[in-house]
């Protein structure tokens, strides 16, 4: 009797395994398709510049405000380049961070510290650390290229009155500060609305919100506020953008290590 029961059990197990594998594959494919559609919102922008305000908000509600200038450059076939330069307050004036995002290779980042008058390369294993006391990490300041993650589609749900795709993405970089990220992308424009970041112990570390989107040149979407709430320490950081301009004629020369020192 036992022999007769083995074969149907094996068949049922194989059917279940096949169904599970197919389901996972379809989920991964759908998650990737959604991520690619979202990424296309930035195709062809060439370059952009903006003025930024960074607010550091303590658990008690105390606020420290910093002013920056930010510019970025589209690099066909690779990740984008960006340069952020602090203008105030005095203790961070002239500090600059240069980022070269790459589609599959580790990103390159350099930090210019005017007090030391030198450019410091940020090692890949240190990019999960906080950026100048904010709740943003060096990793957060680099562009999130599609190719750097594995994806799974989770579900569709309503968020802030918008129907959103909810996907999971897992960083492929072994030095990432995150084990996974849950991303809400609206189904109308495929804009990222919210990200839950999970730390290396798989606890919910931070919640990132993308607010006040505007479209430029009828083609390029820009959030005018990005909020990073730390769920573990109660602190928050807010980036606000103004004077956003596209197609300024920026070139690679504007994003070199020498440009870090010139940007003071």
Can you say where each PLM-predicted feature lies in the sequence?
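Bacterial N-terminal signal peptides that target proteins for export
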Residues: 2-13
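Bacterial N-terminal signal peptides
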Residues: 12-23
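Bacterial Sec-dependent signal peptides at the C-terminal "C-region" and cleavage site
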Residues: 22-30
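Long, terminal "pre-/pro-" and other extracytoplasmic accessory regions
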Residues: 29, 147-156
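N-terminal mature ectodomain segment of secretory-pathway/periplasmic proteins
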Residues: 30-115
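Gly/Pro-enriched, hydrophobic low-complexity segments
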Residues: 36, 98, 108, 112, ...
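Short amphipathic beta-strand and strand-loop transition segments with alternating hydrophobic
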Residues: 71-73, 152-158, 212-213
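Short acidic/glycine-enriched loop/turn segments that link adjacent beta-strands
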Residues: 78, 160-163
């Amino acid at each position: 009797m036992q022999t007769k029961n083995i074969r149907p059990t094996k068949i049922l197990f194989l059917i279940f395994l096949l169904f599970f594998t197919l389901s996972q594959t379809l989920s991964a494919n759908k998650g990737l398709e959604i991520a690619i559609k979202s990424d296309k919102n930035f195709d062809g922008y060439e370059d952009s510049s903006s003025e930024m305000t960074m607010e550091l908000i303590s658990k008690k509600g105390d606020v420290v405000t910093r002013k920056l200038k930010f510019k970025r450059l589209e690099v066909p076939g690779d990740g984008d380049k960006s340069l952020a330069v602090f203008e105030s307050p005095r203790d961070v004036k002239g500090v600059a961070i240069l980022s070269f995002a790459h589609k599959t290779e580790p990103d390159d980042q350099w930090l210019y510290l005017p007090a030391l008058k030198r450019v410091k390369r940020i090692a890949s294993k240190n990019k999960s650390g906080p950026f100048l006391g904010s709740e943003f990490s060096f990793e957060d300041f680099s562009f999130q290229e599609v190719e750097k993650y594995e994806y799974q589609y989770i579900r569709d749900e309503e968020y802030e009155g918008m129907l959103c795709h909810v996907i999971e993405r897992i960083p492929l970089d072994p030095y990432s500060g995150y084990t996974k990220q849950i991303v809400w992308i609206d189904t109308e424009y495929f804009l990222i609305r919210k990200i839950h970041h999970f730390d290396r112990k798989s606890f919910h570390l931070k919640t990132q919100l993308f607010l006040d989107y505007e479209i430029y040149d009828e083609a390029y979407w820009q959030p005018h506020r990005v909020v990073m709430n730390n769920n573990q320490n109660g602190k928050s950081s807010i980036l606000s953008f103004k004077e956003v301009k596209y197609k300024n004629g920026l070139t690679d020369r504007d994003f070199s290590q020498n440009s870090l020192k010139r940007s003071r």
